[in-house]
Amino acid sequence: MNTLVLKIDTILSKHLKKQLAPYTISSQNTYVAFAAKKNGVTVLLYKSGKLVLQGNGANALAQELNLPVAKTVFEASNNSQDIPIIGSDEVGNGSYFGGIAVVASFVDPKDHSFLKKLGVDDSKKLSDKTIQQIAPLLEKQIPHQSLLLSPKKYNELVGKSKPYNAISIKVALHNQAIFLLLQKGIQPKQIVIDAFTSQSNYEKHLKKEKNHFPNPLTFQEKAESHYLAVAVSSIIARNLFLDNLDQLGQDLGYQLPSGAGSASDKVASQLLAAYGMSSLEYSAKLHFANTHKAQALLTK
């Protein structure tokens, strides 16, 4: 996926709107004056006059529309590392026990040497011990914004007849983490989110969020393997999740496993026997199938 950002004048803006009129789409971003999608490329025209094209065919569409590609502010492929980037990632959404940690981090090219010396990589490839050693160093050096949604709060917000589902809650957390980081004066050239849903679905859920920002987003699967900024966020988020999981376990007197396998079913059934459902409301995501499996284990 390529991202093209251009500055166009009023005359070209009117011409563009006429050309793309049959491909118009809605956008809830208050900073966007016009939005369209053609040939898989999303086109966003901001009130400031900035034009953003996102998609693998961005260059081809720009040529088709006779846009001044030579005046591109930047053209970034998915593995571009030579511009200041905000990367956002989450950890914990697939684990029955523990909350959800979302982190947005700002990495400037001048940080690359420091990060490579630390061996920063996708946190999923690193041991928990290594993550716990690296994360404090990253937190000290790299501008970031961390958010932790506790299981108790998660259960209040996510589920049937509740404000959020498992996808929309992550949209809210990513959006808020990035928004708060931008409020600190950070000025990225690109913002990358580790894709957990489609861009259109993300934007649909974003409509009900209070805070918005004008910066375009890049959605990349396995982004932590392509962008150092996302890898940093992945590591900090993993450490935050592990700390939360450990603290919850200490509070209850049980070692809580990560993940959503049979080990989680077993511990959950033990917690139900010892403390009742309130212990799972405090430590786990109740809408997971593990809750029913744990209840079934009690009857055996």
Swiss-Prot record:
Organism classification: Bacteria, Bacillati, Bacillota, Bacilli, Lactobacillales
Gene: rnhC
Organism per entry: Streptococcus pyogenes serotype M5 (strain Manfredo)
PANTHER family according to UniProt: RIBONUCLEASE, RIBONUCLEASE H2 SUBUNIT A
Compartments, record wording: Cytoplasm
Major localization listed first in the record, in broad terms: cytoplasm
Protein name: Ribonuclease HIII
Function statement: Endonuclease that specifically degrades the RNA of RNA-DNA hybrids.
Cofactor list: Mn(2+); Mg(2+)
Family membership noted in the UniProt record: Belongs to the RNase HII family. RnhC subfamily.
Stored Pfam families: DUF3378, RNase_HII
